[in-house]
């Protein structure tokens, strides 16, 4: 249901945006989406985590949010399915983007699926668990822009590797702190979130460096699917790890995922020359929970409706010196 809501909302935003306002619209969407995610985590602090109250509250809030749309006199947008690009094709275009987004989906799912369980297991109370889960989201809001600026100035693969290493170190240090060092634990979570969430946008931006505007939305569909596939695996893997290896394995697994992303980025740097800075597209922050439709809010992207014939020049491998 929520996936459908994201698609509808993003289609509406895309329909009402112009080329001059798409960047602003995506920025506002990013801030509202991440802000809502952070506030939602704080609801754990109410102490109602063992009842259905929070689920009921979420249902009520979603229902209330629909009311202004129903009362609006504005017509519904013309929904069209975007052209898709296969995962196999994406692996040929940008292996790092595909692998990075898949592992990133696993890590995010682990954090939000079992993070609260970890917090309670190390002795945090409900209020502290709320802060523990909110810190990564606000870390993402704080560090998203600086990370994006760095990726526009340097080889994006180097930035992906650096961000993954920093996130891995922060996650590793988090295992050393508990209730008695709660402030230090929050700092680690803030830094970890500031590296985890920007990786999503970094990988998409890296893939876009090899694509034309008409290919970006098609590629986003496949990349979102890869990230979603990783997210499906994350929570069960974290649960199995905690059950068989103990609660201490939670951040060990997350650190391992960050290390894999960094190692693969380093490997890819040895396999393909960097895209020159002047040929790179700008970094565009995209919410982790968005659908492929959000890619259309990127001012550089161009929509290709499903079924429309793709010209030869729209093939990522057509006259592209950076794909090999």
Describe the predicted segments one by one.
Residues 4-17, 197-212:
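Intracellular juxtamembrane helix-capping segments at the cytosolic ends
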Residues 19-29, 126, 211-223:
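Loop-to-transmembrane helix entry/capping segments in MFS-fold secondary transporters
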Residues 44-45, 59-79, 261-269:
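C-terminal membrane-cytosol helix-exit motif in multi-pass small-molecule transporters
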Residues 45-61, 240-258:
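A membrane-interface helix-boundary motif in multi-pass transporters
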Residues 48, 143-155, 242-243:
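Helix-to-loop junctions at the C-terminal end of transmembrane segments
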Residues 59, 158-173, 252-255:
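Structural signature of the two symmetry-related core transmembrane helices
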Residues 90-111, 190, 194:
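Pair of pore-lining "gating" transmembrane helices in MFS-fold secondary transporters
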């Amino acid at each position: 249901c929520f996936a459908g809501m994201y698609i509808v909302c993003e289609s509406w935003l895309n329909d009402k945006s112009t080329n001059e306002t798409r960047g602003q619209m995506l920025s506002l969407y990013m801030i509202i989406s991440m802000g809502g995610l952070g506030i939602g985590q704080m609801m754990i602090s109410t102490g109602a985590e063992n009842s259905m109250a929070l689920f009921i509250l979420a249902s009520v809030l979603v229902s209330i949010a629909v009311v202004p749309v129903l009362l609006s006199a504005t017509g519904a947008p013309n929904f069209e399915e975007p052209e898709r690009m296969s995962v196999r094709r994406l692996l040929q275009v940008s292996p790092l983007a595909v692998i990075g987004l898949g592992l990133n989906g696993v890590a995010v799912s682990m954090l939000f699926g079992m993070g609260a369980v970890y917090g309670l297991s190390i002795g945090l109370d409900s209020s502290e668990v709320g802060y523990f889960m909110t810190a990564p989201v606000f870390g993402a809001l704080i560090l998203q822009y600086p990370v994006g600026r760095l990726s526009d100035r340097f080889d994006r693969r180097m930035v992906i590797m650096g961000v993954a290493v920093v996130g891995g170190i922060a996650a590793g240090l988090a295992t050393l702190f508990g209730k008695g060092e709660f402030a230090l634990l929050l700092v680690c979570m803030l830094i970890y979130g500031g590296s985890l969430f920007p990786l999503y946008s970094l990988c998409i931006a890296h893939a876009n460096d090899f694509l034309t505007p008409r290919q970006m939305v098609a590629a986003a569909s496949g990349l979102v699917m890869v990230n979603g596939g990783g997210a499906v695996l994350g929570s069960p893997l974290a649960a199995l790890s905690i059950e068989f290896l103990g609660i201490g394995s939670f951040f060990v697994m997350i650190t391992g995922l960050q290390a894999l992303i960094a190692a693969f980025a380093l490997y890819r740097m040895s396999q393909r020359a960097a895209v020159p800075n002047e040929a790179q597209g700008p970094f565009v922050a995209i919410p982790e929970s968005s659908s492929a439709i959000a890619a259309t809010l990127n001012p550089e992207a161009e929509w290709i409706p499903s079924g429309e014939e793709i010209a030869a020049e729209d093939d990522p491998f057509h006259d592209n010196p950076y794909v090999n």
